């Protein structure tokens, strides 16, 4: 992302920039750990809310026919389904893309994993990381003409990093765009994917991706759905 694009997005009042120093190591502070426990509890509680939409928490687009765009997404800690409910920006992001290009043009596939706090502490759930890798490889093999978009929120961003580190050159070449929300590893590359194809959305004061602040800014990434969709549309 260039400063020019950052400036443009600011003009349309869409927050998409890192406004505080990123985490520079993978050792989490006690405040980060307690914040993630708080976030996980809120996300789990949202499942029982009368306003929750559990049906939106699961996407299995790879079970259908190939579509021009395949989006693979991993939920955050404490969330349900395979793309998340609660504070997940995933469903809002998918909706923006479907509205822009048509539901028949995009298949969304979630990554199933435990998404507990322990997974966050070990750098991203190992089984989830493997599932992410397997799903990406499947998408590339199953749909050779599709463009692949990958993303994740919170711990889902961690397992996106973990999977991408193991992508083959062929798989990496098929990645059209990456969008990560509240990424604990926001300063680290996404495998060998070109930085120009990666959008890191990290809110000021989000302790999970900046190392300072608190948990509340980590719960508001759904408001960045329009920005995330625009980034992808500019690259497909």
From Swiss-Prot:
Cysteine pairs bridged by disulfides in the record: 66-143, 202-209
Catalytic reaction list: cutin + H2O = cutin monomers
Domain of life: Eukaryota
Main location: secreted
Biological process (GO), any one: carbohydrate catabolic process
Site feature location: Transition state stabilizer: 155
SMART domains: Cutinase (SM01110)
Keyword Nucleotide-binding found: no
Processing and modification events after translation: The 2 disulfide bonds play a critical role in holding the catalytic residues in juxta-position; reduction of the disulfide bridges results in the complete inactivation of the enzyme.
Enzyme class label: hydrolase
Signal peptide: 1-20
Subcellular locations according to the entry: Secreted
GO molecular function terms noted in the UniProt entry: cutinase activity
GO cellular component, one term: extracellular region
Function: Catalyzes the hydrolysis of complex carboxylic polyesters found in the cell wall of plants. Degrades cutin, a macromolecule that forms the structure of the plant cuticle. Allows pathogenic fungi to penetrate through the cuticular barrier into the host plant during the initial stage of fungal infection.
Sequence similarity: Belongs to the cutinase family.
The protein's name: Cutinase
